[in-house]
Amino acid sequence: MIDVRKYIDNAALKPHLSEKEIEEFVLKSEELGIYAVCVNPYHVKLASSIAKKVKVCCVIGFPLGLNKTSVKVKEAVEAVRDGAQELDIVWNLSAFKSEKYDFVVEELKEIFRETPSAVHKVIVETPYLNEEEIKKAVEICIEAGADFIKTSTGFAPRGTTLEEVRLIKSSAKGRIKVKASGGIRDLETAISMIEAGADRIGTSSGISIAEEFLKRHLI
């Protein structure tokens, strides 16, 4: 049996969420045994002050990834200082599409160097990439030294597909972990993504997924 809860990065990234809602979100995620919560930089200090077991993840350059490198670095450093243990970094998709691969790698390396204690996940936005670009994205993330390649911000025109997760997994050959994100809203989809090779699941439906898992397995 796959304990889906241990794969979930439960996201609370909508701009209208109040601090009270973030607090309740963190407490509920922890109560359900969810692995991590993922929040915006403004909410990291609050989430970290509440979290006891659940990991705290922060998005960087979210959701477009087109901030200047210096801004991303500062954002990442401050997030870790505020208590973030993991960083989900949106890479510069425009630079990648422009084949400025050295720039993409160096930007990521600079962020990683300044936040050595963090787990680094790079969001590459697979819904905008073809098969060859996805393979290239895997190699760039590995070269930069990322811990995970993450499929999507969830802000793309569609969600992540099982085929994309399988392609990343087969291309990675065990050299980098995979976080599937985008359109994962129920337990069945989460399980399918894990079976396809996802090591982590990014979703804003983590609470309902965890509750359904517990209901089915009477834990």
From Swiss-Prot:
Reaction catalysis annotation: 2-deoxy-D-ribose 5-phosphate = D-glyceraldehyde 3-phosphate + acetaldehyde
EC number: 4.1.2.4
Chief place where the protein resides: cytoplasm
Gene Ontology CC: cytoplasm
Compartment(s) of residence: Cytoplasm
Annotated catalytic residues: 88, 150, 179
GO BP: 2-deoxyribose 1-phosphate catabolic process; carbohydrate catabolic process; deoxyribonucleotide catabolic process
Keywords assigned by UniProt, alphabetized: Cytoplasm, Lyase, Schiff base
MF-aspect GO terms: deoxyribose-phosphate aldolase activity
Biological or metabolic pathway of the protein: Carbohydrate degradation; 2-deoxy-D-ribose 1-phosphate degradation; D-glyceraldehyde 3-phosphate and acetaldehyde from 2-deoxy-alpha-D-ribose 1-phosphate: step 2/2
InterPro entries (UniProt xref): Aldolase_TIM, DeoC, DeoC/FbaB/LacD_aldolase, DeoC_typeI
SUPFAM superfamilies: Aldolase
UniProt cross-references to Pfam families, sorted A to Z: DeoC (PF01791)
SMART domains according to UniProt: DeoC
Similarity comment: Belongs to the DeoC/FbaB aldolase family. DeoC type 1 subfamily.
Protein function: Catalyzes a reversible aldol reaction between acetaldehyde and D-glyceraldehyde 3-phosphate to generate 2-deoxy-D-ribose 5-phosphate.
Protein name per UniProt: Deoxyribose-phosphate aldolase
Provenance organism: Aquifex aeolicus (strain VF5)
Gene: deoC
